[in-house]
Amino acid sequence: MIKKIEKSTNQLADNLAKLEKRLFGTAWDSVVINNKINNGEFVYWVFEQDNQIVGYLAIQKTFFDIHILGIGVLESHRNNSIAKKLTQELISYFEVSDFNKILL
């Protein structure tokens, strides 16, 4: 199931940072993630399975554009179209927004 994250807790931000570190070997600090989600600068979409986050897509909103910060899926859950579904959520969000473009 996909959830859009626009409000965060310390625990959620810590889980997101751990997932990113597990996927890529580096991650935003959980305090930064928490603050930037809660101030509206970052938005995350997460894919949960059995109450565990197994994939995510993160964006940063700027004045006119959306910047994709990262997208990833745990190796054990790949080839199930999770990244595609997360990207479709972003596109739907973009289509009803006032942003000009999506940047990588």
Predicted regions and their residues:
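Acetyl-CoA-dependent GNAT
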Residues: 3-76, 84-89, 93
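Conserved GNAT acetyl-CoA-binding A-motif
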Residues: 94-104
